[in-house]
């Protein structure tokens, strides 16, 4: 006599067992939890020759240049930083929900304008560049301003499959110009401090982004309507200095690291934001906008 047929019949008659723990859905981790667990290899230090320290009375703003998108402007900005062009100048514009702008407030007055030293007085417009040759990490979601969006290095980028361009996200650094598209030289710069004005993409040369210190710029007192330029020079925010990190001894450089946008950690953090299902969120969006993805930065 054998028990096998009886055991088989009994097994078939029982309700299915719950999924094994290994098959259960993974517990949701927030983007911050994912970032906190990132291995050291997922972080990198921006190149010192592309890092600017903007020192204000209230603290330091750290900026990263993007020479892969605007090489001529980045080179000119480096020249002006080495020659201390911005030292003693000011933030002379703060427009609500738009930008702060800084440089020489008297630049249009030849009698008062500060010399740009050995910087080039004319540069080509650098609105976009070929996508080929860039390591483009694409996002899965549709965008109203570009057929494709994603990241190249530390920068949010739009693309049409042929060309790529930097996006006007919060913290983007752009080179102010007049009506002529090639009228920017990098002496007058602005930082986006409001909702992302993506209509400016491919209309102005973007040269980098703020990595740290946005709170020092976004809280500057707004200038008068309609454009935010201060009428009273006393209302401007003085710039103590803008310095290239590469001009300082290594011991004096800020030990800043940025999460690699081509890392699994970054991809997982983006997905956690796209489909947030924690105790507060009742419906996952299943979508994320390019400019709603913060770039994780840390000081070591």
Tell where the protein language model's regions lie, with residue ranges.
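Positively charged n-region of N-terminal signal peptides that target proteins for export
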Residues: 1-5
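Bacterial N-terminal signal peptides
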Residues: 6-16
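Cyclophilin-like peptidyl-prolyl cis-trans isomerases
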Residues: 19-300
């Amino acid at each position: 006599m054998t028990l096998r047929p009886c055991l088989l019949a009994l097994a078939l008659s029982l309700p299915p067992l719950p999924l094994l723990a290994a098959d259960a859905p993974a517990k949701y981790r927030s983007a911050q939890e994912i970032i906190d667990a990132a291995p050291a290899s997922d972080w990198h230090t921006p190149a010192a020759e592309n890092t600017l320290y903007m020192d204000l009375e209230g603290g330091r703003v750290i900026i990263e240049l993007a020479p892969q998108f605007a090489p001529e402007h980045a080179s000119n900005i480096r020249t002006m930083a080495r020659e201390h062009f911005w030292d003693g100048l000011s933030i002379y514009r703060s427009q609500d929900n738009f930008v702060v702008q800084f440089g020489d407030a008297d630049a249009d007055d030849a009698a008062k304008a500060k010399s740009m030293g050995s910087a080039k007085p004319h540069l080509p417009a650098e609105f976009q560049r070929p996508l080929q040759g860039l390591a483009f990490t694409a996002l899965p979601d549709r965008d109203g301003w570009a057929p494709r969006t994603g990241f190249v290095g530390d920068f949010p980028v739009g693309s049409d499959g042929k060309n790529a361009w930097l996006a006007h996200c919060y913290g983007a650094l752009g080179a102010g110009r007049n009506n002529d598209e090639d009228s920017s030289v990098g002496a007058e710069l602005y930082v986006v401090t409001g909702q992302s004005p993506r209509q400016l993409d491919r209309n102005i040369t973007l040269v980098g982004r703020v990595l740290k210190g946005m709170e020092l710029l976004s809280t500057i007192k707004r200038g008068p309507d309609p454009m935010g330029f201060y009428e009273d020079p006393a209302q401007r925010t003085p710039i103590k200095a803008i310095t290239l990190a590469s001009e300082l001894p290594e011991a004096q450089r800020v030990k800043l690291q940025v999460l690699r946008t081509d890392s699994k950690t970054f991809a997982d953090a983006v997905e956690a934001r796209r489909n947030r299902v924690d105790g507060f969120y009742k419906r996952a969006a299943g979508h994320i906008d390019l400019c709603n993805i913060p770039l994780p930065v840390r000081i070591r």
